């Protein structure tokens, strides 16, 4: 599937330190050590509604990683999926009386516009689940063949769905570190079906949902139906990149069940101990002290902000003001502060000269390499900007160097 426009990324002189990121599986910050080509898989949207700031914060986070790898001289193979086979999409299409494919196409187009406006670098492979059915079927066949999957007995219900055995890998649970009770609760809350009759274990995850009347379905050797959520990402990642990813990423709400099962699906057929070397998760974004949710009706949409002539660079800078792993709140104050900061940065970098900037660029690189510490990086830049505006300087190349660093590393257009 076509992604979005890729803005040019300027090249800074020199190199920054090695990137270190918090790994959700190991529960610690440690170095990310990609090979000749870095690999990253980030879970994409379910295209049934417009992009809100929670989505934006996640993709801006992984855009920082993308930019830091480029700054380190790495090539990158970045894959992102589109979950265009999922119940929320079908339910929204039914509610609105539109074809689910048309709804998905419209929302994907809007998402791409939002990402381009926020200057998020696109993935090399942008893959809809509907484009990878054959890969999913092949992966399910392998899981059935090795005993990691089973078909629900016909005596237990009309539909012979296929499930993945949660105990198919000895290491199941390492990615989240959650206990069984927490896993069961989150399965119930996040699209699982622990109470489904006929399952070997309540935690077992759906791989193939046999066709039901009125639901979209695709042909397969085990009958018409559609894939489960987790196998979509496992199949797309394995077919586009292979096992042993440098990073699997997404929002913190994907730690379990989605990323745990995606990893287990891949590991049971690849034989790898870990699907990814790093599991990286971004925190959630709330609005004015409340969780942002459709039920509350308090979603802040990127497209709505753009329609109000809010500058996307200010939105991006506002999201970067907090640490990526922290759950945090968006507010008018956050936006106002980001807008004012953007104006100050533009004023300073437009000066004919300023204080020497080599040190501040080195500090920005160092802070970002330390688990994407954007608050410290922004504070360092604020310090240089204050000195430039209030005291001036004699380095004619400094303003341009700072502007280039802000563009290349933070993705903010001045």
Swiss-Prot record:
InterPro entries xref list: Cys-tRNA/MSH_ligase, Mycothiol_ligase_MshC, Rossmann-like_a/b/a_fold, tRNA-synt_1_cat_dom
Cofactor(s) needed: Zn(2+)
GO terms for MF: ATP binding; cysteine-glucosaminylinositol ligase activity; zinc ion binding
Top-level class of the enzyme under EC nomenclature: ligase
Presence of the UniProt keyword Ligase in the record: yes
Keyword hit for ATP-binding: yes
Alphabetical UniProt keywords: ATP-binding, Ligase, Metal-binding, Nucleotide-binding, Zinc
Motif ('KMSKS' region): 291-295
Binding site for Zn(2+): 43, 233, 258
One GO location term (cellular component): plasma membrane
Cofactor note: Binds 1 zinc ion per subunit.
One of the protein's GO biological processes: mycothiol biosynthetic process
Enzyme Commission code(s) on record: 6.3.1.13
Chain residues that bind L-cysteinyl-5'-AMP: 43-46, 58, 81-83, 229, 251-253, 285
CDD domains: Anticodon_Ia_Cys_like, CysRS_core
Catalytic activity from the UniProt record: 1D-myo-inositol 2-amino-2-deoxy-alpha-D-glucopyranoside + L-cysteine + ATP = 1D-myo-inositol 2-(L-cysteinylamino)-2-deoxy-alpha-D-glucopyranoside + AMP + diphosphate + H(+)
Locus of motif 'ERGGDP' region: 189-194
Pfam families, alphabetized: tRNA-synt_1e (PF01406)
PANTHER family: CYSTEINE--TRNA LIGASE, CYTOPLASMIC, CYSTEINYL-TRNA SYNTHETASE
Subunit structure and binding partners: Monomer.
Function text: Catalyzes the ATP-dependent condensation of GlcN-Ins and L-cysteine to form L-Cys-GlcN-Ins.
Family, similarity comment: Belongs to the class-I aminoacyl-tRNA synthetase family. MshC subfamily.
NCBIfam families: mycothiol_MshC
Full protein name: L-cysteine:1D-myo-inositol 2-amino-2-deoxy-alpha-D-glucopyranoside ligase
Organism: Mycobacterium tuberculosis (strain ATCC 25618 / H37Rv)
Lineage: Bacteria, Bacillati, Actinomycetota, Actinomycetes, Mycobacteriales
Gene: mshC
